Design a protein with these regions (language model features):
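Mid-to-C-terminal "cap/lid" subdomains and adjacent gly/pro-rich loops that border
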Residues: 1-89
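Glycine-centered small-residue hotspots that permit tight backbone geometry or close packing
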Residues: 1-2, 106, 172
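Short helix/loop capping segments that flank catalytic or ligand/cofactor-binding pockets
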Residues: 9, 18, 107-108, 184-186
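C-terminal catalytic lobe of FAD-dependent flavoproteins
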Residues: 51-147
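Short, flexible loop/turn elements at secondary-structure junctions
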Residues: 3, 13, 100-102, 178-180
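A generic structural signal for short, solvent-exposed coil/turn residues
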Residues: 30, 88-90, 100, 115, ...
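A glycine-rich dinucleotide-binding beta-alpha-beta segment and adjacent secondary-structure elements
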Residues: 94-97, 120, 125-198
Length: 198
């Protein structure tokens, strides 16, 4: 899987209409391994922010990251309260999807359900190649954008509160090939056998 971090930037007002564009509107390669994409949700996806985001939190472990998040809340209580207001969130928020092409993995495990029949699928850090819980380039990008837009930079709540990594691509991407025999997409990200499907 990709090394990933999912961050967000909530703008102070609706003047930019961030929702009124394609879902992935821009991207930049900040170094040889790190690619940042800017993603928008539709203007009626406010629940996403209320459930998934916390104040931007720096590097640390399962003890220090929650403490850093709490310190951020104490230092900026009004910003934190503004962040909690879910109404209109998706219409003024950019998701900052940070991806790295480093070799790491998430392990899947089937475990029996605690009550009842069946199994549940759980994920764990791969012991040999764990994916990172913090990507510095992503936090720097979120801080830079917040400073230049007067917005509020945010981390995924599981990353900030429990130092658990997040990913939007748990099974990897589409294989790039020279033909349908050895890939799903070509070098220009076009799906083989389809027109206008990127």
């Amino acid at each position: 899987t990709n090394s990933e971090s999912i961050l967000a930037l909530t703008l102070p007002d609706h003047s930019l209409e961030s929702w009124n564009t394609v879902a992935i509107s821009a991207s930049v390669h900040v170094d040889a391994d790190t690619h940042i994409e800017f993603v928008t949700y539709g203007k009626h996806a406010d629940l996403m922010g209320a459930l998934l985001l916390a104040p931007l939190t720096g590097n640390g472990n399962r003890i220090t990251r929650p403490l850093k998040m709490l310190g951020n809340i104490i230092r900026h209580p009004l910003r934190f309260l503004r962040m909690l207001w879910p109404f209109g969130w998706s219409g003024r928020t950019l998701i900052i999807l940070v991806m790295q092409s480093l070799d790491n993995a998430i392990a899947f495990r089937a475990k029996p359900k605690l009550f009842g029949k069946g199994i549940k699928l759980v994920t764990e850090q791969d012991a040999e190649k764990p994916n990172p819980t913090y990507i510095d380039a992503g936090n720097k990008a979120a801080e830079y954008l917040a400073e230049h837009t007067n917005g509020i930079a945010q981390s995924m709540s599981l990353e900030a509160m429990a130092n658990i990594p997040s990913t939007a691509h748990i099974l990897g991407g589409a294989v790039i090939g020279s033909s349908p025999a050895d890939g799903v997409i070509d070098q220009n990200q076009r799906v083989f056998g389809y027109q206008n499907l990127l």
